[in-house]
A protein has these predicted regions:
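Juxta-kinase regulatory segment immediately upstream of eukaryotic protein kinase catalytic domains
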Residues: 1-23
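ATP-binding glycine-rich loop module of kinase domains
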Residues: 21-23, 27-74
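Short, solvent-exposed loop/turn segments that connect beta-strands within catalytic domains
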Residues: 39-46, 80, 94-100, 186-194
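A conserved alpha-helical element in kinase catalytic cores
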Residues: 53-92, 127, 211, 217, ...
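Conserved structural core of kinase catalytic domains
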Residues: 82-136
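Conserved kinase catalytic-core helix
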Residues: 112-195
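Activation of the activation-loop gatekeeper triad in protein kinase-fold domains
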Residues: 198-204
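Catalytic-core segments of enzymes that bind and process phosphorylated/nucleotide-bearing substrates
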Residues: 206-238
Length: 240
């Protein structure tokens, strides 16, 4: 059977970007992630990650504001914000006549997500291990805070494009060691950061389903917290 072709952006797209090249790199639910080379206002090429949310309801002014507010919550949360890359939100039509959709832009980070990195490679660099410990502590704090407040939490799950084992570990057993939403960059940024939480949006199903929100906070959130604590002990043992 012939493998279906990957999605592609039309050359005459209506995005407010001067796109030199684009490559489809991930798919999860109603979201698509593109790797792009774009030309800025000075004529310089920049490489970005563009996340497209195809659910029309999320492109309303109200929902766009909620997306920005959730990003600002993550960015300003003590201990967690340092892991969140700068993100720009906007809405646009992909092609003439299309319904507007919601988009988010981040500078492209070269690296791999946790589900793609085996233990021995992930734990090889002590600085990465230290940052993972910091991240896990911050993730526990934000899970506890959102549970107390009854508000939306970050998505520490695994996308459907990951391996079956990563999905089983991350989505069934709540083990965020395998999340597709944390990336370890190949090289540190100007602040020495290598660990990044790259999905600054709310899980789409949680966003529209109040019952799912409660279950995720009270059940899966607690399970993720338990697994984060176990992971911290494992990471700390690597530094001894």
């Amino acid at each position: 059977m012939e493998k279906p072709s990957a999605p592609h952006l039309p050359e005459d797209n209506r995005l407010p970007l001067k796109v030199n090249e684009s490559e489809h790199i991930a798919e999860s639910g109603e979201s698509t992630v593109w790797k792009m080379g774009i030309q800025d206002s000075l004529g310089n090429e920049q490489h970005i990650a563009l996340k497209q949310n195809r659910r029309e309801a999320f492109a309303s002014d109200e929902e766009m504001q909620k997306s920005k507010e959730f990003y600002e919550f993550l960015k300003s949360f003590p201990g967690f914000g340092k892991f969140v890359p700068e993100t720009l939100y906007f809405k646009a039509r992909v092609a003439e006549g299309d319904t507007p959709q919601a988009f988010a832009i981040q500078s492209l980070l070269e690296g791999r997500t946790l589900d793609e990195i085996p233990d021995e490679e992930l734990y090889r660099d002590p600085e990465v291990v230290k940052q993972l410990i910091e991240f896990a502590h911050a993730a526990i704090d934000i899970l506890q805070q959102t549970r107390r407040a009854g508000t939306l939490k970050p998505d520490f799950g695994v996308a459907g494009t990951a391996s079956e084992e990563a999905q089983r570990q991350g989505n069934t057993f709540g083990n965020s060691r395998f999340t597709t939403n944390v990336l370890v960059s190949d090289a540190p940024d100007e602040h020495g950061q290598r660990v990044f939480f790259i999905d600054t949006g709310v899980n789409a199903d949680e966003r529209v389903n109040k019952t799912r929100q409660v279950v995720e906070r009270q059940v899966m959130g607690r399970l993720r917290e338990f697994n984060f604590n176990r992971w911290i002990k494992k990471l700390e043992a690597r530094l001894k």
